[in-house]
């Protein structure tokens, strides 16, 4: 059996995620998920044979809000998982510096030394 990455069952966002900054409300991922909510409202009108763009504007707004809210927590979880992965990677790099030699950094116009 494969061990799970997060041993705590049913934890969407651990308490450790509170230390991260919240995603910006103008994050393109959030705006895209809100747009998907709007499209789902249009598809709902299409399936129920209502006028697509004009019927149920309150319902479309509800879909946008619900998708945006769910997307906010999905983006927050994604940021948390990336932060955990980065912490593990940098911890490994700190413990094994011989595997990661520092390369010489030079500018475009400068001559390379060595």
UniProtKB/Swiss-Prot annotation:
InterPro entries: NDUC2 (IPR009423). Signal peptide: none annotated. This is NADH dehydrogenase [ubiquinone] 1 subunit C2, isoform 2. Complex I is composed of 45 different subunits. Keywords: Electron transport, Membrane, Mitochondrion, Mitochondrion inner membrane, Respiratory chain, Transmembrane, Transmembrane helix, Transport. It comes from the Eukaryota. It comes from Homo sapiens. It is a single-pass membrane protein. One of its GO terms (cellular component) is mitochondrial inner membrane. The keyword Mitochondrion applies. The chain crosses the membrane at residues 56-75. The keyword Electron transport applies.
């Amino acid at each position: 059996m494969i061990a799970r990455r997060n041993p705590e069952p049913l934890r969407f966002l651990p308490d450790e995620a509170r230390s991260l900054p919240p995603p910006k409300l103008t994050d393109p991922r959030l705006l895209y998920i809100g747009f998907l909510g709007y499209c789902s409202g249009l598809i709902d009108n299409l399936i129920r044979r209502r006028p697509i763009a004009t019927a149920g504007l309150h319902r479309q707004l509800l879909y946008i809000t619900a998708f945006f809210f769910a997307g906010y927590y999905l983006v927050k979880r994604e940021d948390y998982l990336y932060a955990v992965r980065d912490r593990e990677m940098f911890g490994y790099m700190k413990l094994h510096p011989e595997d990661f030699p520092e390369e010489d950094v030079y500018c475009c116009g400068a001559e390379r030394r060595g």
